[in-house]
Amino acid sequence: LRIGCFASIARARLPELLRAFRALHPEIKMDVLVRGDELPAALASGEIQLALVDEARAKGFDFLPLADTPLVAVVPPDFPWEGETIPLERLLREPFLSSPDQYIEPFLPPDTPRLEVTASDDGSILSMVAGGLGVSVLSAFSLVGYEGHVRVLQLEEPFALRLGAAVKSLNASGTSARTFLSFLREYYGKNDTP
């Protein structure tokens, strides 16, 4: 079974998911492709059979919602803000780091000053935030491994990203993909964490 996912999902959840799945189904061999915005094209072309993505990138595919993960403000450790929550408008007064087609883009005014980072990897953005180059809004999944390097603030108006599994067609999916989808359905039904 060839699956694709974002680097943040690969860091935050995939090891645990694959370990649990392999314990139940050692006969199914897994191949993981870690990519960014290219995942829908990889799914459409058949390069992968299943993609763990956000709902927006699953457009045109059958999508099994699994969990919602909050979007959070990520700022340098010395960012001059006292509270634990921050209005998006205040955050946008700073140089804003984002990648093209990032999930926060639809919520931003078109004239938002930002430094475009041509990277599909949230890790690059987090490193730049840690280096004091600006601020960002990312999925809470993205923060795994960066704790202590950046400061995390809740957004005053909460936003969440719906994550799930996308396949070309539930009916046309192979046995391995259907088995993995059933596993995900059961796993996320028992576990409250995204």
Please provide the spans of the model-predicted regions:
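Short amphipathic alpha-helical coupling segments at ligand-binding clamshell hinges
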Residues: 13, 17, 84-87, 172-186
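Paired acidic/hydrophobic, glycine-rich loop segments that form the ligand-binding mouth/hinge
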Residues: 49-53, 134-139
